[in-house]
Every structure is written in C-alpha cells, then in structure tokens.
Amino acid sequence: MKTHRELQQLGLDSFTMSQFTGTGAYYRISRRHLLTDGTKHLAEKGECFWMMDAIASHLSEIGTEDWFVLVRIKVTDGMAVMVYEDGNDHEHARQEIPYTNFPLDSVTLYACWDQENWIIMLPSEY
C-alpha cells in the first residue's frame, strides 16, 4: 500500500477525497451507469476504472428494487474483496479480485438509482 504522502501526491488522501461534495457533472461509463466528480477522480488517480466496471456489472444484476447499494472494497496483500450490501448489513453480492495494485487499503462507495441511471458516488457526495 502507498504511504500517506504518496496518497497525498496522488490526490487520494482522506482530506482530498472528503472535499468532493455533490458533483458538478456526471460521467457515463455505460448505458445506465454514471460516475460523479469524486468517483471519476478516484478511478483516474487510483487507476481503477476496472473497479467502476465491476460495480456497474453487479448493480445490473442486483436490479433496482433496492435504490441504494453500499459497496465496500477492502484490499489485503494485493487481493481485493468487493461487498455489495443494502446499508443494513444485508449482502447482495461479493466478488474476490485475485490481484490488484489499488493504492488504498479500503474504500466505501455508494450507488443510487435515480429511476434512469445508477449513480456511483463517494459517501461525501451523497
């Protein structure tokens, strides 16, 4: 994992990430999936568009009955586990990633259905 200084240089430290509140624009990654300013920043600086694609794929499988999905990503020894839940400890899906160089130990993202698109966002953008 990266040091705090390295994360600062990448713009992925907790202070920088918490500065994303709301969003000025949406960025389409598929027909029904959008990123916010914060998740686009995370995908670019963390080189993890693969993560956004994985989230979009699972959201399509989960469906829209639950309009809110909490996504927890935890990285240990170069492997990641992505857990999709409803925010009340009910797990929708789990995916193991056998190798990743994602620079953070963990990250939590939210996904909200707006009746047309899933919007993937940082918690501070909710």
Per-segment meaning from a language model:
Residues 86-126:
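Short, compact, well-ordered microdomains
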Residues 1-95:
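N-terminal "domain-start" segment
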